[in-house]
């Protein structure tokens, strides 16, 4: 009965949010613009992209005039790391704080299999379509994404800045001879980029909304990607619907997540994501939304990107490494 009441509350909340928001995109504050776009350099392709997007022209006008940072600049947010360290032991509890990720994982993997098989000319019906490819999972947590990627044949490196997450991931992976081959590292994307590591595909799901500097973070992801390699990111749109469902609904009504897990001001719109990646030499090729059905408890791929969405892009081979 309690679960039914909570679902009904969430449905009413989402309906109210739809009425409140006539547009799925809500302009961010000046502070957020400075956090997202902390560099003044723009290449020709970024300028071209911006000129066709009036909203992004506004964003660029408010960007900080700081000089370009090197890849060694960290994008870590210590407060966010502390949050995830506190619940690291629950990564593989399917009914715990990470229940939404467990439920979303099959849908995320369906998008990844489809786009990356197409990108690398692989057979999506194969049991191991990613055999022979090197993938890196940035912000891997307990390994929810790294493990199925390894089972699909990829040589996987999982990276997380929280030591407890990495330990949990290693312990769980060691229970399976296939996943035990995953290389788990407690480090950052920036450090690996400085070391010159390269991968066929770089994936970072539900991470960018937790970093201190998304633009710098995406530069590091690009630096880790081989020319013409693939990049996959997922995050939460900054809309009233997203606030209603991911913060009010998931944290306060359904209590799937600890209160304070998400900050609405840190959510990233698809326009911002596209421009950030464009500046990092990654061209976004496809974006899909995730829609949750509270009756079935399942997530579906959708054209609706007003809350959760996932993006696939390619590293421009003509520009080489950044």
Curated annotation (Swiss-Prot):
Binding-site positions, S-adenosyl-L-methionine: 108, 139, 160, 205
GO molecular function (one): polyprenyldihydroxybenzoate methyltransferase activity
Biochemical pathway: Cofactor biosynthesis; ubiquinone biosynthesis
UniProt superkingdom: Eukaryota
Subunit structure: Component of a multi-subunit COQ enzyme complex.
Topological type in the membrane: Peripheral membrane protein
Function: O-methyltransferase required for two non-consecutive steps during ubiquinone biosynthesis. Catalyzes the 2 O-methylation of 3,4-dihydroxy-5-(all-trans-polyprenyl)benzoic acid into 4-hydroxy-3-methoxy-5-(all-trans-polyprenyl)benzoic acid. Also catalyzes the last step of ubiquinone biosynthesis by mediating methylation of 3-demethylubiquinone into ubiquinone. Also able to mediate the methylation of 3-demethylubiquinol into ubiquinol.
EC number, UniProt record: 2.1.1.64, 2.1.1.-, 2.1.1.114
The keyword Chaperone is annotated on this UniProt entry: no
Record family assignment: Belongs to the class I-like SAM-binding methyltransferase superfamily. UbiG/COQ3 family.
Keywords for the protein's UniProt record, in alphabetical order: Magnesium, Membrane, Metal-binding, Methyltransferase, Mitochondrion, Mitochondrion inner membrane, S-adenosyl-L-methionine, Transferase, Transit peptide, Ubiquinone biosynthesis
Protein name, entry field: Ubiquinone biosynthesis O-methyltransferase, mitochondrial
InterPro entries listed in its UniProt record: Methyltransf_11, SAM-dependent_MTases_sf, UbiG_MeTrfase
UniProt cofactor(s): Mg(2+)
Reaction(s) the record says it catalyses: a 3,4-dihydroxy-5-(all-trans-polyprenyl)benzoate + S-adenosyl-L-methionine = a 4-hydroxy-3-methoxy-5-(all-trans-polyprenyl)benzoate + S-adenosyl-L-homocysteine + H(+); a 3-demethylubiquinone + S-adenosyl-L-methionine = a ubiquinone + S-adenosyl-L-homocysteine; a 3-demethylubiquinol + S-adenosyl-L-methionine = a ubiquinol + S-adenosyl-L-homocysteine + H(+)
Principal location listed in the UniProt entry: mitochondrion
């Amino acid at each position: 009965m309690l679960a039914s009441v909570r679902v009904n509350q969430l449905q009413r909340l989402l309906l109210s949010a739809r009425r409140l928001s006539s547009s799925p995109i809500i302009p961010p504050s000046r502070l957020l613009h400075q956090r997202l776009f902390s560099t003044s350099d723009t290449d020709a392709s970024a300028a071209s992209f911006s000129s066709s997007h009036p909203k992004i022209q506004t964003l660029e006008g408010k960007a900080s005039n700081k000089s370009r940072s090197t890849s060694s600049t960290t994008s870590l947010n210590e407060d966010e790391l502390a949050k995830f360290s506190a619940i690291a032991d629950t990564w593989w509890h399917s009914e715990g704080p990470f229940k939404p990720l467990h439920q979303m994982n099959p849908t995320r993997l369906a998008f990844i299999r489809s786009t990356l098989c197409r990108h690398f000319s692989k057979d999506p019906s194969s049991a191991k379509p990613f055999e022979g490819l090197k993938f890196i999972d940035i912000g891997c947590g307990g390994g929810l994404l790294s493990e199925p990627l390894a089972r699909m044949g990829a040589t996987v490196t999982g990276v997380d800045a929280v030591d407890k997450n990495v330990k949990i991931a290693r312990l769980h992976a060691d229970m399976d001879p296939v996943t035990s081959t995953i290389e788990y590292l407690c480090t950052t994307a920036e450090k690996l980029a400085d070391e010159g590591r390269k991968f066929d595909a770089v994936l970072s799901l539900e991470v960018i909304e937790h970093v201190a500097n998304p633009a710098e973070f995406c530069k590091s992801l690009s630096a880790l990607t081989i020319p013409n390699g693939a990049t996959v990111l997922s995050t939460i749109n900054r809309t009233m619907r997203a606030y209603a469902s991911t913060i009010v609904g998931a944290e306060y009504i359904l209590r799937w997540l600890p209160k304070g897990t998400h900050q609405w001001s840190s959510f990233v719109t698809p326009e911002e994501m596209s421009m950030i990646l464009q500046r990092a030499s990654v061209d976004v090729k496809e974006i899909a939304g995730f829609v949750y059905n509270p009756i079935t408890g399942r997530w579906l791929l959708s054209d609706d990107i007003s809350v959760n969405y996932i993006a696939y892009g390619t590293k421009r081979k003509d520009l080489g490494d950044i």
